């Protein structure tokens, strides 16, 4: 298990608002992994499977699921709170994405990877090169243990925020789309510049019930749809509405 690091660098597959369904996961990890120490300080408190990704996971042909909790004592205010982010998060906050509506969810997906896994920011969505340029796009590219990794970010909740639990049909639709988009963006990324070793699907959900629905939806998918993708499923708590209402 990798030790928890503080990252002072910067960083998100086609950014469209994902309000009505969750992304997916395939199987919970061992309980011993869930008791990892909290991540180092920043905006919000991280706990759960911090540091759970080993270098072997980044090149393995098999998928993996990591579950994390992100608790916010108060709402994030931009730009006043930018100095509390990693340098990568600050870069993302100052860089427009490719027309998506979920900028803060992408920033805090990166913050989790930076603070828990020691990820370093490489490129934002608009900086990654694709061939053809019309390819599906991922949200950011990071460096993790010497490996380039693509990161696709989505939110798994029933919209509008606070309108009730995520339903299974919507969850299956979202998981199918997001895992499929990862295959498409990996096929389209420019091979000599930004080619990554694999991708992470970073999913944020606002309670344990929606997280469980998302995992159950992922379990219904054919393994070929999931491929070798790493699922990082983050359940947010506290004053977390800004993650789901940032348009």
Each model region followed by its residue ranges:
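Active-site beta-strand-loop-beta-strand hairpin of nuclease catalytic cores
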Residues: 141-153
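Ser/Thr-rich, Pro/Gly/Ala-heavy low-complexity intrinsically disordered linkers and tails
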Residues: 1-41
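Interdomain/boundary linker segments immediately adjacent to catalytic/signaling cores
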Residues: 36-117
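A short acidic/basic microdomain associated with nuclease active sites
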Residues: 114-143
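Catalytic cores of nucleic-acid endonucleases
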Residues: 154-221
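Structural alpha-beta junctions
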Residues: 114-123, 219-240
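Loop/turn elements at helix/coil->beta-strand transitions in domains of secreted/extracellular proteins
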Residues: 146-149, 196-200, 226-229
